[in-house]
């Protein structure tokens, strides 16, 4: 009897344990009683739809992630047959999708379609559409720090020093933004535009896109003869969604754009955005995006994708603008403080942010493409990389990325006799400990087109004696670093660390830019 009772108790425990395990499993996977499950193992929420008709709920009680667009989902299919059969099933049920991207086999559905045929019957897998926005204005920087930045106060064309290469003729540039307003700067520009955000291409809130477009192809822009394909994906408040961004990317690619500018972002990676970026990459489109103005140590998407050229902002003297996000995957640094651009009602305004910096790169690429017609898109990007000015820590760094765009070097690249040695940077790590001895790295760069055989670098720390270094052979674009060790002032000290340096070639009279041979900086610990 005891054995029978023990057996029954053991059996009951097994059944109870199995029930508990099933309940926990369903809760962890996000399952409801109707067979809809969610999976977050890939870093984003993926919806698994039921594959049997009787498992489909009449209504879906779905918990939408933060920043997801409520009341709608994105359904992905792996083949065109299933994709078309699902669309046909919706029509037969008297339903319709909110949107679809045929090239990506993606359907956007709302609440009404959620009560229709299960996408799982057709092999569909779901995800969410997320809020996308233009980079926020750089307001998080303390006013006293922001005041230290030096605004350009000039148009893009003046900043780059006139024509870079070609005028953009024959190049089609796509702009995904808040639309574009009529402005005298665009009187001679051929513009095709569509509105995916529903506010009208030139409706309220189009000022951001207008400023971006004027840097690229306005009469005061870098490539004034380029043609524009403007896709409005942001509303009058600068907000949009990742479905419209993906749709805009695909439409721009299908229209044949050469370069695509995206001064917008979202911090949620999605399958939909990845597929759209891959689609553009497969069609050899150069993509450029703003790194963002939030001061984070990560970048938003699409700038964070390796296929996209990400751009941070610098001020008039080449300093990082304090507000941009930081990442070692940043590709270029370009002007982004107080750039004079077009605005509504035919006027002009000072435009700041990585949203301003990105179109400098886009416009420059359009200019080069219109002149270097035999170069591939990859070769044109590599050409820009080879003429960047070193800044920040040696090599690629999270603040300046690979370097600052230098338009003079772009123009001079085919003149083989230019001598230009530059004092590129005096670098002390931001995490230098007050009161300790730390290395200061002094970076010299050959910004000319001829080889440097010998130069002399002189470094002065505080009131100390000058220290000389001999710089050997440097090829065009190459850099070299010398270190000096010094005491960093303590945290409670009012002293600052002053360092000055100068580099002189053995033929100083042949140096075309003596103004970049010297640099002086001071470091002061931040008082708590």
Task: Label every PLM stretch briefly.
Residues 30-50, 54, 62, 253, ...:
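C-terminal subdomain of the subtilisin-like protease fold in secreted/lumenal serine endopeptidases
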Residues 162-173, 179-192, 200-243, 305-307, ...:
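Subtilisin-like serine protease catalytic core
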Residues 182, 191, 203, 313-355:
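Catalytic-core environment of secreted peptidases
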Residues 213-216, 233-234, 258, 322, ...:
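Hydrolase catalytic cores
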Residues 177, 292, 353:
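Active-site glycine-centered loops adjacent to acidic/histidine catalytic or metal-binding residues
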Residues 162-168, 239-261, 270-287, 296-312, ...:
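Mature extracellular/periplasmic domains of secretome proteins
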Residues 6-11, 21-22, 51-67, 93-102, ...:
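Protease zymogen maturation seam
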Residues 407-528:
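Extracellular/luminal regions of secreted and cell-surface proteins that mediate adhesion/ECM remodeling
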């Amino acid at each position: 009897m005891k054995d029978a009772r023990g057996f029954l108790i053991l059996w009951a425990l097994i059944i109870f344990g199995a029930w508990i395990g099933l309940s926990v499993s369903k809760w962890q996977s996000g399952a409801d009683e109707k067979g809809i499950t969610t999976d977050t193992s890939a870093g984003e929420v993926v919806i698994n739809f039921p594959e049997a008709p009787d498992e489909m709920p009449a209504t879906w009680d779905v918990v939408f992630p933060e920043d997801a667009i409520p009341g709608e989902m994105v359904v992905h299919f792996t083949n065109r047959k299933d994709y078309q059969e699902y669309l046909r099933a919706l029509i037969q049920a008297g339903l319709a999708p909110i949107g679809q991207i045929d090239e990506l086999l993606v359907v956007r559905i709302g609440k009404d379609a959620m009560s229709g045929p299960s996408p799982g019957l057709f092999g569909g897998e779901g995800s969410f559409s997320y809020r996308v926005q233009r980079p926020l204005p750089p307001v998080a920087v303390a006013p006293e720090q922001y005041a230290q930045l030096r605004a350009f106060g000039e148009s893009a064309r003046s900043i780059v020093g006139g024509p870079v290469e070609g005028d953009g003729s024959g190049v089609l540039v796509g702009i995904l933004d808040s639309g574009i307003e009529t402005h005298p700067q665009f009187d001679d520009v051929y513009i095709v535009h569509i509105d995916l955000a529903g506010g009208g291409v030139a409706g309220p809130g189009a000022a951001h896109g207008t400023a971006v477009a004027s840097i690229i192809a306005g009469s005061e822009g870098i490539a004034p003869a380029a043609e524009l394909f403007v896709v409005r994906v942001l509303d009058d408040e600068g907000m949009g969604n990742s479905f419209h961004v993906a749709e805009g990317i695909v439409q721009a690619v299908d229209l044949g754009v050469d370069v695509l500018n995206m001064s917008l972002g979202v911090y949620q990676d999605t399958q939909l955005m990845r597929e759209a970026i891959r689609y553009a990459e497969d069609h050899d489109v150069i993509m450029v995006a703003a790194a963002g103005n939030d001061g984070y140590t990560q970048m938003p998407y699409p700038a964070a994708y390796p296929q996209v050229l990400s751009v941070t902002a610098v001020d008039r003297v080449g300093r990082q603008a304090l507000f941009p996000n930081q990442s070692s995957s940043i590709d270029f640094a370009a002007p982004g403080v107080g750039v004079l651009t077009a605005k509504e009602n035919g006027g002009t305004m000072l435009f700041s942010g990585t949203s301003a910096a990105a179109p400098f790169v886009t416009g420059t690429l359009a200019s080069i493409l219109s002149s270097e017609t035999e170069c591939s898109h990859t070769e044109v990007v590599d050409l820009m990389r080879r003429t960047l000015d070193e800044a920040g820590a040696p090599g690629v760094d999270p603040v300046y990325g690979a370097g600052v765009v230098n338009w003079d070097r772009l123009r001079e690249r085919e003149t083989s006799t230019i001598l230009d040695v530059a004092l590129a940077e005096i670098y002390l790590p931001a995490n230098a400990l007050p009161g300790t001895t730390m290395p200061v790295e002094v970076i010299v760069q050959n910004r000319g087109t001829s080889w440097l055989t010998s130069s002399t670098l002189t470094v002065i720390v505080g009131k100390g004696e000058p220290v000389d270094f001999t710089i050997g052979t440097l090829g065009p674009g190459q850099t070299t670093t010398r270190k000096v060790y010094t005491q960093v002032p303590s945290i409670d000290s009012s002293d600052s660390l002053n360092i000055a340096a100068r580099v002189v070639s053995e033929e100083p009279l042949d140096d075309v830019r003596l103004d970049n041979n010297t640099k002086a900086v001071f470091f002061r610990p931040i008082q708590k």
